[in-house]
């Protein structure tokens, strides 16, 4: 009897619903943190291993997928990168605009402290853009080691175009390597329930949520604005693109991409998850192999919200008046900063001083705002990453489905 049961159990774990398994891991993680903090801290190793495995496989996955898709791209075959890029930029700006409206409707103030720490933000938007451009000419090995996805994309695109002139054997080898890496990614993702279990247990055991209560209103504004973008703004953009009910697609992306990103708190680690979801949705591989890593770099709606809300909270605390043109300018600046957030150590929080500089707020006070961001980062960073990463696959799917509908309608007319 036992010899028959164990394979059945293994098959259920290997082929069962991943979402249900993750929910079980989530509940067990919360229970373990509540029952025994030392045990919860110990199983944190499972979460560290899971995130480490995703981060390890993501750079080589992006390199091989982009190389393979470009090298094997047939002349005349259309991709949908332009409309996806437009959706990324429009979505980020819309998120910043929504954050301005939300901050005016529910103004927040901060309890500023002087514990900003030894961190050095970029001196201006030019430096942010310079860092982004310099990352394009990074050494390919260095880009793979450091997870510099702009550099990886540049090298992958360049090598892909070069390999178009190679013989079919070489192209087949690159394609086989791409399939092999994809298999490894699927294997890593099957361990997600154990990773989520470890991440939830250790996070609750080491930090808890007691420190967040002092910033309850600010968190409500931040998370509320992110929910508004995820459930109202993004569905409107998707409806505009596909002209049908967007919510099945929106909720699918939040469930199968956002949940992972919420717990891993890393857009880079979530790239393999998004790639797998795109494959499940039967999207064009040539498109999503480029748009997903590109989105992890520049599609930063959550970062735009964080920069805008915390900047306006600092402005309210200092009693600085803000008129409509200035608020609109802040939306533009926050969008530009958010698009460059991946090129800055510390991400969106260290770009807050750039936005604060618009209102004449000194760097000392701006860094205190950054310190507040680090305090609430347990929840803020999780929600931000979930919004950013789920939007990558959402906009990619919307653009691909819109193109499929256009081609189907064109075929019917003919």
Swiss-Prot record:
Keywords: Amino-acid transport, Cell inner membrane, Cell membrane, Membrane, Symport, Transmembrane, Transmembrane helix, Transport. It comes from the Bacteria. It is found in: Cell inner membrane. Residues 37-45, 105-142, 201-217, 321-331 are periplasmic. It comes from Shigella flexneri. Its main location: membrane. One of its GO terms (biological process) is threonine transport. The keyword Membrane applies. It is a multi-pass membrane protein. This is Serine/threonine transporter SstT. Pfam families: SDF. Gene3D superfamilies: Sodium:dicarboxylate symporter. Residues 2-15, 67-83, 164-179, 239-299, 353-414 are cytoplasmic. InterPro entries: Na-dicarboxylate_symporter (IPR001991), Na:dicarbo_symporter_sf (IPR036458), Ser_Thr_transp_SstT (IPR023025). It catalyses: L-serine(in) + Na(+)(in) = L-serine(out) + Na(+)(out); L-threonine(in) + Na(+)(in) = L-threonine(out) + Na(+)(out). One of its GO terms (cellular component) is plasma membrane. One of its GO terms (molecular function) is neutral L-amino acid:sodium symporter activity. Involved in the import of serine and threonine into the cell, with the concomitant import of sodium (symport system). The gene is sstT.
């Amino acid at each position: 009897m036992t010899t028959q049961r164990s394979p059945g159990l293994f098959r259920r774990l290997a082929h069962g619903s991943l979402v249900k398994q993750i929910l079980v891991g989530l509940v067990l993680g919360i229970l373990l943190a509540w029952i025994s903090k030392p045990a919860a801290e110990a199983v944190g190793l499972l979460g560290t291993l899971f995130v480490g495995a995703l981060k390890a496989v993501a750079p080589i996955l992006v390199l091989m997928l982009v190389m393979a898709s470009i090298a094997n791209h047939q002349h005349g075959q259309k991709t949908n990168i332009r409309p996806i890029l437009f959706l990324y930029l429009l979505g980020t700006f819309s998120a910043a605009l929504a954050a301005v409206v939300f901050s005016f409707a529910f103004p927040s103030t901060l309890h500023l402290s002087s514990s900003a720490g030894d961190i050095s933000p970029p001196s201006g938007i030019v430096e942010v853009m310079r860092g982004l451009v310099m990352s394009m000419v990074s050494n390919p090995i260095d880009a793979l080691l450091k997870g510099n996805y702009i550099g990886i994309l540049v090298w992958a695109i360049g090598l892909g175009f070069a390999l178009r002139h190679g013989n079919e054997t070489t192209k087949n080898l690159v394609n086989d390597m791409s399939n092999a890496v994809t298999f490894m990614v699927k294997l890593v993702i099957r361990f997600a329930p154990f990773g989520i279990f470890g991440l939830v247990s250790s996070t609750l055991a080491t930090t808890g949520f007691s420190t967040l209560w002092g910033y309850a209103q600010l968190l409500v504004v931040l998370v509320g604005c992110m929910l508004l973008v995820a459930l109202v703004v993004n569905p409107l953009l998707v409806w505009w693109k596909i002209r049908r009910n967007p919510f099945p697609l929106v909720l699918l992306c939040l469930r199968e991409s956002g949940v992972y990103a919420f717990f891993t708190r890393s857009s880079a680690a979530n790239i393999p998850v998004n790639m797998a979801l795109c494959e499940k949705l039967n999207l064009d591989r040539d498109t999503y192999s480029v748009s997903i890593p590109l989105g992890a770099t520049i599609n930063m709606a959550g970062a735009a919200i964080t920069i805008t809300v915390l900047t306006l909270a600092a402005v309210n605390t200092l009693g600085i008046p803000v008129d409509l043109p200035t608020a609109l300018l802040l939306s533009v600046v926050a969008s530009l900063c958010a698009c460059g957030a991946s090129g800055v150590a510390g991400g969106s929080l260290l770009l807050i001083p750039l936005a604060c500089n618009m209102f004449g707020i000194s760097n000392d006070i701006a860094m205190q705002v950054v310190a507040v961001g680090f305090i609430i980062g347990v929840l803020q960073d999780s929600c931000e990453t979930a919004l950013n990463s789920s939007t990558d696959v959402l906009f990619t799917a919307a653009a691909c489905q819109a193109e499929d509908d256009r081609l189907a309608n064109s075929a019917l007319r003919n």
